[in-house]
Curated annotation (Swiss-Prot):
Source superkingdom: Bacteria
PANTHER family reported in the protein's UniProt record: 3-OXOACYL-[ACYL-CARRIER-PROTEIN] SYNTHASE 3 (PTHR34069), BETA-KETOACYL-[ACYL-CARRIER-PROTEIN] SYNTHASE III (PTHR34069:SF2)
Catalytic residues identified in the record: 113, 249, 279
The keyword Transferase is assigned to this record: yes
Free-text domain note: The last Arg residue of the ACP-binding site is essential for the weak association between ACP/AcpP and FabH.
Protein name: Beta-ketoacyl-[acyl-carrier-protein] synthase III 1
Organism field: Deinococcus radiodurans (strain ATCC 13939 / DSM 20539 / JCM 16871 / CCUG 27074 / LMG 4051 / NBRC 15346 / NCIMB 9279 / VKM B-1422 / R1)
Function: Catalyzes the condensation reaction of fatty acid synthesis by the addition to an acyl acceptor of two carbons from malonyl-ACP. Catalyzes the first condensation reaction which initiates fatty acid synthesis and may therefore play a role in governing the total rate of fatty acid production. Possesses both acetoacetyl-ACP synthase and acetyl transacylase activities. Its substrate specificity determines the biosynthesis of branched-chain and/or straight-chain of fatty acids.
Keywords, sorted A to Z: Acyltransferase, Cytoplasm, Fatty acid biosynthesis, Fatty acid metabolism, Lipid biosynthesis, Lipid metabolism, Multifunctional enzyme, Transferase
Subunit architecture: Homodimer.
Compartment(s) of residence: Cytoplasm
Enzyme class: transferase
Entries under Pfam families matching the protein: ACP_syn_III, ACP_syn_III_C
Amino acid sequence: MKSIGITAIGMYVPERVVHNHEFESRMGIEDGWIESRSGIRERRFSAPGEFASHIGAKAVQDMLARDPDALKDVDLVIYATCTPDAMFPSTAALVAGQVGLTGVGAYDLSTACSGFVYALSMARGMILGGSAKNVLVLGGEVLSKALDQDDRDTAILFGDGCGCAVVGEVPAGYGFQDFVLGADSAGGPALYISNLADQFPDGQIMRGVPTMNGREVFKFAVRVLGDSGTQALQKSGLSNADVDWLIPHQANIRIIEAATQRFGIPMEKTVINLDRYGNTSAGTVPLALYEAVNDGRIQGGQQLLMVVFGGGLSWAACTMKWWGGRPSLHAQVAQPAEVPA
């Protein structure tokens, strides 16, 4: 069986930086309260007229700046987002047009914060099944445009940004090993954005605005991050000691700390960037992956574990041996290591 993995990566975050003090002063919150409870110091908000397709295209352009051939033979685009430009056409199709991909398949995937890992799994399956050769996968959001800016439970947590990856064939010994995907709709009312159907609690619906029960989400997240990650490792014949880098969904530092304790993986092996970007939903994992590769922490031959959770309630985990053999897959100073035979 062919080895399928990531062959190129890119990212983009909007220029506007929104610091905690903007919320704390406006909401009458004590200085330092947001960071102490979430680990978030700042986040990025998109400009007026800047939507998911635009930040997606800019992430792809960043990738192309480092690897001009990254989109060669890409024949499918999947965009994981819960803040699309429109119900249709798909935001994936809009991105394809903006980056010069014509005649390719394109669709959006909505699994909230779990979306990017879900999309990686789908891309791998479609390549192995012969339906695609190379797949451009994006995970990104412009949640600032959907937030109730007076809601303490959500407004302070979310930010905007997009990461992208090309999925294709990689040398033997590298790439994706196993995936775990799951969802439980019984927990749906704990985290949702209502749209067409009035099926969530009466009196609490604000159409198009994220609504969250933080206490329930915390308990769920700690459990499923630990369980799904352990399942993925077991499917791959690995243990937590084999993991070089854990890349978790960047929702809340307390969730991450509790999950790493459940894993037995130290925080020193955990990629964290929520302090600067907040929760970008489907964008958190590709943004964290990109930064850790770009600064030289993640290098070729290292074992990665990605774990995510989101609305649905949903969850996903992925084990992967990082390749690092193309320009955007390693830092300028880092050289990819060989995988032992």
